[in-house]
């Protein structure tokens, strides 16, 4: 599943790869090819490698976008944590507060506090309400979080 925002971001990346990156790399390959012997042309090899990466990413994104299940999380009017929820929790060991959003695998980005629906923390949070405790096993051991706030 993807949120509307996540789907839009993937579509934008795909548009950029097709409309900007692909033409740029084609031009770079043509430029490198004009420098002569391709067998010892590092510029040409690097451009071909980048082209391969870009084409692979385009294929991957086209597949994801074509079969994406987009969920409008603004329609969630519930006090229960579900896909798309923004959850404020407090670590019961450290009293540190953190806010996470539960998203699909392609949107997950821990630096933006977006956690995958399939992650251990998200699995522990799903179905809980404000005041509940979510427990899961982290690499550093068992973690417990109290749920302070849920929003969509």
Question: Whereabouts are the PLM-identified features?
Answer:
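Non-DNA-binding regulatory cores of transcription-related proteins
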Residues: 71-145, 151
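Conserved NTP-handling cores and scaffolds of large molecular machines
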Residues: 14, 18-21, 65-69, 129
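N-terminal cationic and glycine-rich segments that engage phosphates or anionic surfaces
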Residues: 1-15, 19-49, 53-56
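Preference for short coil/turn "hinge" residues that link or interrupt alpha-helices
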Residues: 10, 31, 63-64, 108-110, ...
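Low-complexity, intrinsically disordered basic tails/loops
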Residues: 48, 52-55, 63-71, 77-78
């Amino acid at each position: 599943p993807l949120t509307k925002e996540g789907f839009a971001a993937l579509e934008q990346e795909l548009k950029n790869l097709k409309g900007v990156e692909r033409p740029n790399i084609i031009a770079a390959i043509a430029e490198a090819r004009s420098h002569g012997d391709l067998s010892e042309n590092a510029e040409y090899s690097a451009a071909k490698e980048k082209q391969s990466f870009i084409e692979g990413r385009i294929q991957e994104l086209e597949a994801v976008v074509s079969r994406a299940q987009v969920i409008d999380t603004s329609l969630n009017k519930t006090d229960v944590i579900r896909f798309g929820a923004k959850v404020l929790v407090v670590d019961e060991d450290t009293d540190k507060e953190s806010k996470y959003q539960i998203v699909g695998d392609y949107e997950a980005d821990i630096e933006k506090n977006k956690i995958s629906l399939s992650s251990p923390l998200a699995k522990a949070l799903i179905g809980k309400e404000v005041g509940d405790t979510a427990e899961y096993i982290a690499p550093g051991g068992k973690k417990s979080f109290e749920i302070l706030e849920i929003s969509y």
